[in-house]
Amino acid sequence: MKRIISLFLVVLCIGGVTVFAKGAVTVSSECDISDINVPLDNTPVNAAIGQTLDIKAKSAVLMEPNTGRVLYENNPDEKLPPASITKIMSLLLVMEAIDRGDLSLETVITASEHAASMGGSQIWLEPGETMTVNDLLKASVIASANDACTALAEAVAGSEEGFVALMNERAAELGMTNTHFKNCTGLDAEGHLTSAYDVAVMSSALIKHTLIKDYTTVWMDSLRDGKSELVNTNKLVR
């Protein structure tokens, strides 16, 4: 059963962010996943999952990552603002760029004025500051840093606008019919929406890149020769 719930946990681990705009997908700390008996056929298992997990989200999906089989769903197609869960798609495109050889973990990126201007969660990049892809990934995943994520986006596509176009193209390729991205970070923007089902789909694509687990499983790290601490607020990785 650990394999079956892996995607659900990965969705929670990305960037230490567990929320849509107005509702967290939570796992009760007292639940025993081993008590869930999942049929081998396509029999719905919503009842069994619902009795075991304390789910308080407006929408939720539990998907088996290898087959795409949905084990539990609640309003799976409702369009909601994804906040920093947006970074799942951003990270997927960065992983794919690394696989293509367009970037490496040692590639040095110079922060633009635009990247440094991002609000919300950030590592306070200065315009002209340089940082490796590896460090920007750490900042994006562990601290959900919007400036770091934007710097990566610009390195992949030349601009955030160009990167967002790639995000929407990739979403369409994955069949994410309830998703439209307006930025790479998840900062509030009208029409920037996705659904629980689409989050599961893009998460399934992301975790096929084993490199991402080097970042999503980290509790604490640092940047700038130890001068800037990174702490993952997700208690599941502590």
Residue ranges of predicted features:
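Sec-dependent N-terminal signal peptides of Gram-positive bacterial secreted proteins and lipoproteins
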Residues: 2-21
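Domain-terminus/edge residues, biased toward the C-terminal soluble/receptor-binding domains
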Residues: 1, 173-180, 188-238
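Intrinsically disordered, low-complexity regions
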Residues: 16-17, 24, 118, 227
